[in-house]
Regions:
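N-terminal, membrane-interfacial amphipathic/helix-forming hydrophobic leader that caps
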Residues: 1-100, 245-250
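Membrane-interface helix/loop boundary segments of multi-pass membrane proteins
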Residues: 167-193, 222-229
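Active-site His/Glu-centered metal-binding helix of metallohydrolases
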Residues: 166-171, 175-176, 200, 204, ...
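Hydrophobic residues within alpha-helical transmembrane segments
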Residues: 78, 116, 120, 163, ...
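Functionally important transmembrane alpha-helices
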Residues: 41, 45-52, 198-199, 208-250
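Hydrophobic/aromatic residues in alpha-helical transmembrane segments
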Residues: 124, 128, 163, 176, ...
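Hydrophobic alpha-helical transmembrane segments
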Residues: 33, 73-74, 111-116, 154-158, ...
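Juxtamembrane helix-loop-helix connectors linking adjacent transmembrane helices
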Residues: 55-73, 95-164, 182
């Protein structure tokens, strides 16, 4: 799965099994490099600071102290959509297709694989959480106060989960993995960097929350390299994000 094979680099050929040591070095594209820096550094840092800035107010007053819809959910949705628009803009400027970042394979098989992946990962992380608790590495309790309380809030939460599954998978799996590896030429290093960046944006959830996000990032990356499609990753990501609506302790 992780081996490189020959194929020219264009369009869909950014995907994992289609690189080659014998091809000519791909010229640096400024748009891709700037977007990689934004996705790997700026976005995770800004997400962390945004959520961290709300925690003192959450700790002091609970969810009643802030308007979850306007201060958390809507800003998050807008940021996710902005990121996806940036990816779209860079793809258009560089004359690339959405399929070049894995936005293809919208079929029942990939949907089912994504659902099964989510179920398996949920069981794995549930068992892992018991080990983390023994070392007092629990998720920040303030995070639970971000969960919706009303029907309109739940609707926004679902919209937020949808936008996150689209934007974050397109960014950290689709764009970062395919573009960064063109320069690093090492899938394991590429996966590690992408997963650390993905994890750092979840530090506001505490050590355990960031750890789980990093683990998810690694397995999402492997799933993407296997299926060469973001559909299973987006499906699993969406299910993971909406699960707290039915089981807050998850």
């Amino acid at each position: 799965m992780m081996e490189e094979r020959q194929s020219p680099v264009s369009g869909e050929n950014h995907l994992p099994d289609e690189t080659s040591e014998k091809r000519t070095i791909r010229p640096v594209k400024v748009g891709s490099v700037l977007l990689l820096f934004f996705l790997l550094v700026i976005w995770p840092l800004s997400s962390y600071l945004l959520m961290k800035g709300q925690q003192p107010q959450l700790s002091a007053t609970g969810s009643q102290g802030i308007d979850l819809s306007t201060q958390i959910y809507l800003p998050t949705i807008l940021i996710e959509l902005f990121v996806f628009l940036l990816i779209t803009l860079v793809l258009r400027l560089e004359r690339e297709s959405f399929s070049s970042i894995g936005l293809k394979g919208f079929d029942l098989r990939n949907l089912l694989i994504g659902a099964l992946f989510w179920f398996g990962m949920s069981l794995f992380l549930m068992l892992t959480s018991y080990l983390l608790r023994s070392y007092n590495l629990s998720t920040s309790p303030d995070v639970l106060r971000l969960l919706p309380r009303t029907t309109p809030q739940r609707s926004l939460w679902i919209m937020m989960a949808t936008s996150a599954s689209l934007a974050e998978e397109s960014a950290f799996r689709g764009f970062v993995l395919t573009r960064l590896n063109l320069y690093l030429k090492n899938w394991w290093l590429t996966i590690l960097i992408a997963s650390i960046s993905f994890s750092s944006g979840h530090l506001y959830q505490g050590t355990a929350g960031a750890f789980f996000a990093g683990i998810y990032g690694i397995f999402f990356s492997l799933l993407f390299l296997w299926r060469k499609s973001l559909v299973p990753c987006m499906t699993a990501h969406f299910l993971q994000d909406v699960t707290p609506l039915f089981s807050p302790l998850s």
